[in-house]
Every structure is written in C-alpha cells, then in structure tokens.
Amino acid sequence: MDLYSELTAKYQTVPAIATEIINLEAILNLPKPTEAFMSDIHGEYNAFQHVLRNGSGNVKSKIRSCFRDEMTEATLQRFAFLVYYPSERMAAIHREMAGDDLQQWYLTTFRRLIRLLAFTATKYTRSKVRKAMAPEFVYITEELLYNDADTPDKLAYYWQIIRNLIVLEQADQWIAATCQTIQRLTVDHFHVVGDIYDRGPAPDQVVESLIRRDRRHSVDIQWGNHDILWIGAAAGSALCIANLVRISARYNNLSILEDVYGINLRHLARLAEQYYQDNPAFSPKMERSDRPITEAERLQITQIHQAIAMIQFKLEGPVIKRRPEFDMDHRLVLEKLAPDFSTIKLNGDTYTIENGCFATVDPADPYKLLPEEQEVIDSLVESFTHSEKLHRHMDFLLDHGSMYLRYNRNLLLHGCVPVDEDGNFIGLTIKGTTYTGRQLFDMLEANLRLAYSQPTENADLATDLMWYLWTGPNSPLFGKHDMTTFERYFISDPKAHVEGRNPYYHLRKDPEFIKKILAEFVLDPEVGHVINGHTPVKKGTDPIMANNKMIVIDGGFSKPYQKTTGIGGYTLLDNSYGMQLVTHQPFTTKADAIANLTDIISTRRVVETEARRRTVAETDIGTELQDEVEVLKRRLGELREEE
C-alpha cells in the first residue's frame, strides 16, 4: 500500500486530516532527539549496561541541569545512581533507613523524579512520553507529571497519590519504572556500530538488553566482523563455526557456547583428548580474574583449542580453492609446510615451526579431514543451526542490523570501505561483475541474508562469502590483507605476523577522502560524517579526523584493549545542539559501581556545534513526516473540493 492509500484510509474526514496535519507540523518543530553511538562491546555486558543506563553520561548531565545548585555533589551522585540502578540502590536504602527517615526519603525522591522526568520529557510529545512509561503506571505517572502540585485545588490530590503508592507498597516499583523511563528519554536512539560479540563473557546478555530496549524501535546495529562469525555459525557455515569455537577456547570462554547456547562440544573434547597434548601456544589466555580454572580444565581447553584450530585450517583449503575470485591462495598454509612439519615457506621466506600440533595432517593431502574430525564438524553444525536461543539472538541482529547505515546525514559502518593506495574503491568480482564501494556492501549483505535464510546450504557462494567477510582481503569488516592466525600460533618471527591494513585507515584522515566516501553512499559530503568502529584508538591518537568529518568510536569495552588505549573507550552523542565525543574511563565491576557509587568518569569534547538547535524536521524521520503532511494536505484539498 502506498503512502497516499495508507493515510487516506486512516484519516477520512476533514477534521481528522486537519488534526493530524497540526500534530505532525508541531512535531516537526520539536528539538531533534538525542542519539548515542557505541561500538565494539565485545561481550562486556556490565560495562555496556552502565553506559546504556547512564546514557553515555547524559543522565547525570540532565540531573545537573535540572537541579542546578540544589544538590551537593554527593547528593547528585546518589540520585544519579538511583536512576542508573533503581532496584539495587533501593535495596541499599531499605538496609540503611526505616520509619520516618524512609518515608521522608520516598517523598523527596518522588518529587525529584517527577521533576527530572518532566525535564527530560520537554522535547517529546505526550504520546511519545507515554510510550516510554511502564504500562502499569501510565495513569499515575501522567497525573503526577502534568499536574501542578502547587495549585491548592490539586495539592491534596497530588500528595494522596504519592501516599497511596507508599502505603500500598508500590513505591519501589514506581520508582524503578520511572527511572527506566528517564533512561529511555535521555537517549532516544542507540546505534551499535558493530561487534557485540567476541571474547567477552556475556554477549547474549547484551543482545537481551537491546531486545528489551527496542520496544520503541530505538536500536540499530551495524554488523562487526565478530558478529558475522556468529551469524555465519547460525547459518551453518562450518568455517565460521570453527573460527568461533577456536576464539572461545583461546579466551577461556567455551561456557558461552555450552551453558548459554546449548552447543554440544562432547565430540570435539573426545577428539582433542585423543590427538593432542599440552601446548603453550594454545593454552587459554586468562585475561579475566573472575573465571579461574583448574589445571585439568586448562589442559582440556588447550587440547580443544588445538583440535578446532586444525579443523579450521583444513576447512579453509577447499573454500579457497573453489573460490578463486576471493584471491586467497596465499592463505593455503598447510600445503606450504615441510613434510616433517619442521618448517614452512611463506612469501619466499622459510620459518621454523614452533609448538607444532599436526598429528591429524597428512602431508600428501593436508586439507583432508579425518573421519573423526568430519564427525565433529558435522555435530557442531547441527548444534549451531538448531540452537533456539542463538537463532532468536541472530534473528534480532538480522532484523535490526545491516552492513552500513545512513542515518540523519551520517554514515555508520564498523570496519572500512576497501580502497587502494590512491583511494580508489576496490572489492570483489563475482560472476563477471565487479563490486566496489557501496555496491560491495550491498552485494555482501544480500548474500549474508540469503545464506542465513537457507542453513542447510553450506557450500554455496553466499555461505562462503560469510567467511570472506570475516577474513577476506577486501572485506569491509576485516580491513586487512591477511589474517595471520596460523603464523601467530607457530612462528615466533614477528615479520610473519604482519597483516597489512587497508589504505582506508590512513586515508581517512583526509577530508576530501571522507567526502568521497559520503558521496559514494549518497550523503551530503559537506554536512555528513563517517562514524567508525573496529579499531582501538591508541594513546596519543586523535579519534576525530578529517576536519571533524571522521569520528572513531571504538567503545574500548574489551579490557585487553584498554592497555593499548589507556581509556575505557569512546561513545558519541548527537543532539539538537550538535555532536559530543564522550571519553570513558575503564569500568571496574557492577558491584563496585553500586556499592561505592563509582561512575565511569567521562569527559566530553565538542565535535560540532549547531548554529541553532536542529529540529525533528531536519532528521530522516522529519523527512518522512513532511511527506505525510504533503499527502494529507493534498487529500484535504480534494475533500474540500468535493464539499
């Protein structure tokens, strides 16, 4: 149904059409809602949740603006943490207070929350504010929000509502619901610029929290390279599965597979115990002190790590050979090993193999899987493609995600736009057609969605392209020429570890290059920005480049990367006043944050200031609303002519 048919069916009379025109044109003049951008969460749920709850520092800023000099810094901090973590903070209040002190706390807190809610709701319609409220408290909250308690006629009415909430033991529930409403209104829309998944312990909880938040369609995702592994695994790609399991073993994170998604690893564990011994190159990285393991567990993970790595290297061979268009023959590493596995020749240089584990590799046919290995990978494909929870989460990533997004003048993408040294777009030639720039992204996304829709097809081009997205030389999500996984396991010479970043990463400092990219994606080069994730911003490196047109917001949630960055990463806020880059210090733990009121210390840097406040009319939604207004005015004219 086209827009005209849809609107004329919904609004059939002159008064109805006129009312909707008045409503829409009023909305167009409201201030632009606040967007927040974050990326590279890497499964760090608690740090992600803290940023989500505090709105990238925006909640505290709202409190400060609302109450100005009425609160001490300590009082402001306590109130902010109530808004962030209402249930946990109220439990602490109940331990600390009782009787009249608790009653007074309730009365004071109710008044403060109503004031803050009113302050955060000023740039939204009543309808939108209502949708952000908990349904069970809509009536009560609206009565408190839109009534003047200082009017004598309503004063008793106002306070009776509050007293009854306390007497009927609904005060805690109302406070929690109102705090969550304030969180939702403080940031209207969240953009996740890739990599929900990776080495962190709880990517599933990150997805669940996004699903909960999305009841107002307020979340979008631009897939990252690690996300693609999980989407590919759910789609039945054996290579994506092997990579994913290997990374989980490497970072002592197999529990996410077994305990969360119900993936059966028994066949893999038996194979690993049969063929592999201890090996320092495959011992799990113990980057998290909260997940200690026994020596027996460490040995088992080390064996599993080797077994799945060998399966991965074997699976790569047939795909590379049947896809010459991928131009990845240089990654056929197993056939470059000496027959005794003591050395390997790569790019004209011979390297000594250290910590080798090639018991299942036949030098005469190095990519052939043993029957036991084939049984393992078949079992894993079966588990991944039939995990209900995994598919529910991947469905959400597919429904709300894309390879890139054009949103309110800006281009959001996780990795890069592949180019050569001169800045010319490069890509892939498939069946005689060369795809570069925006066409490359569109082609890869179309194939990803095709592969996901047919999980029983696992040797087709669409499925192979999912693996290419993870590791291919011209993959927009990888951004390097080589993924030197094999070399890092078995060769100590750092020369062999070089992966070669795409020239995009040094060219993106040039304003003209960024304008070229914006034009390629049909955005205004003069006012648009590229918002990028994927690469941690090293100490001393500026995340704002190209005369403020390129903004790198790797979230820095992953603790190992914080050694490189020195901070907890960046998020970006874009509101009616302009853009601000928010720098976060590393997050400790949720328990520490709540017990000690330890916020992530954030500093803000203005990226761009609007000459005047931007309105809804200057957003993508505003363009849609203006189209609706034009159609309604046309229909209004038609009805008046018929009178």
Curated annotation (Swiss-Prot):
Pathway: Carbohydrate biosynthesis; gluconeogenesis
Residue stretches in coiled coil: none
GO biological process: gluconeogenesis
Enzyme Commission code: 3.1.3.11
A Pfam family this chain is assigned to: FBPase_2
Keyword Manganese belongs to the record: yes
Recorded family membership: Belongs to the FBPase class 3 family.
Catalytic activity, as annotated: beta-D-fructose 1,6-bisphosphate + H2O = beta-D-fructose 6-phosphate + phosphate
InterPro entries, per database record: FBPtase_class3, Metallo-depent_PP-like
Keywords: Carbohydrate metabolism, Hydrolase, Manganese
Any GO molecular function: fructose 1,6-bisphosphate 1-phosphatase activity
Protein's name according to its UniProt entry: Fructose-1,6-bisphosphatase class 3
Cofactor(s) for this UniProt protein: Mn(2+)
